[in-house]
Amino acid sequence: MAKSNSKDIVLIGAGVLSTTFGSMLKEIEPDWNIHVYERLDRPAIESSNERNNAGTGHAALCELNYTVLQPDGSIDIEKAKVINEEFEISKQFWGHLVKSGSIENPRGFINPLPHISYVRGKNNVKFLKDRYEAMKAFPMFDNIEYTEDIEVMKKWIPLMMKGREDNPGIMAASKIDEGTDVNFGELTRKMAKSIEAHPNATVQFNHEVVDFEQLSNGQWEVTVKNRLTGEKFKQVTDYVFIGAGGGAIPLLQKTGIPESKHLGGFPISGQFLACTNPQVIEQHDAKVYGKEPPGTPPMTVPHLDTRYIDGQRTLLFGPFANVGPKFLKNGSNLDLFKSVKTYNITTLLAAAVKNLPLIKYSFDQVIMTKEGCMNHLRTFYPEARNEDWQLYTAGKRVQVIKDTPEHGKGFIQFGTEVVNSQDHTVIALLGESPGASTSVSVALEVLERNFPEYKTEWAPKIKKMIPSYGESLIEDEKLMRKIRKQTSKDLELGYYEN
């Protein structure tokens, strides 16, 4: 691809991934023309919405699935290090947006909140203690605390300790105070507004991308439909970025690129219990993650979360899976069936055969009543009353199913996946957790993989936005502590001030 001063890029979707990428791109290439098309009437309506995403502020401080028990009994914390570094990278970029005036009021989207792990049972307590010792020895997590003392836990998680005095059983908890809660809906809306204000960007709502055609010169002709009038128009662009959440797989298939073959998706909704009693909500001030049931995927990790939504403290417990054919909460019941093609049907069937326990788990979750959900909640909060909680359905996640040399046909991919065409003109983001929390690292991966000819030119611009860019927060303790102190100041978190 010949390099010129200006390029056109179409961003599909106005969720956290598209707006993050767009916010970064307008800073490093202000002369490029950015066209954002969102099928709904405003940004952050699907999985980026604060009521639709599950846990937030994923920094591997309390999520036990990021620290893995090894056959020799040791605890592998390598994934936790990576996730933590990626969240630190996100905080740097958000801090830059605040300092540069692109977005305002950081406390509107990020708030300080302790992150706590809580387990019951002899084996789980041993796991948590071993995890604590492994993490405590590493600078990134050396502020972690651990206790098996119910009196200490009464101070950390008083709501959860109610009703346990007579028979507390074997339990333990670990805590890191310097966690956060992130309102990704509010952050996304702020970034979308900033992109709209950019002179070379347009953000159009109620506009749906319906087709693609690659031209002989390598550019793409993107067909866009106005959902209010039914009118269609064509936008010629150098690059297509598909950040449409659950809608990404069908759109990727429409491009016809070879990389879209042998891919499929399995849609899963999250359901949560939301507390409606302010007196209960006020007694809990933390994110508390438990241990996922044996043989179940990471999305099943139960957690009782303080969340800040519309400036108010709320309390959520879940998740509970809810399977349906829609790829988007505002999608069609035909989404799953339309995504089945002759070139991916064997991939999907292989996934079904390989993952019968997951299918059974999903079915069991679907038929679970509210009372069943409340019984799960009572393992965290024994005195929970039905009348204080409402069951609601959150957003959709589409688990990526693909063929890989290592795992064969029908491998279910957990996490966020970047797929691009061989000529790097089409880029799609697929998958889910910890997607939003690591969205900035995902955007950097997109830049590095698909725009190598700009690497030298862009590096100092990226370094200005993300001071640790090109360096390792995992290996450089001094830099890690410096960055944490700076982002805490920029985002008004109040940590590390002494």
Curated annotation (Swiss-Prot):
Keywords: FAD, Flavoprotein, Oxidoreductase, Tricarboxylic acid cycle. Its cofactor is FAD. Its EC number is 1.1.5.4. GO terms for biological process: tricarboxylic acid cycle. It is an enzyme of class 1 (oxidoreductase). It holds the Pfam family Mqo. InterPro entries: FAD/NAD-bd_sf, MQO. GO terms for molecular function: 2-hydroxyglutarate dehydrogenase activity; L-malate dehydrogenase (quinone) activity. The keyword Oxidoreductase applies. It catalyses: (S)-malate + a quinone = a quinol + oxaloacetate. Pathway: Carbohydrate metabolism; tricarboxylic acid cycle; oxaloacetate from (S)-malate (quinone route): step 1/1. The keyword Oxidoreductase applies. PANTHER family: L-2-HYDROXYGLUTARATE DEHYDROGENASE, MITOCHONDRIAL. Belongs to the MQO family. HAMAP family: MQO (MF_00212). This is Probable malate:quinone oxidoreductase 2. It comes from Staphylococcus aureus (strain MW2).
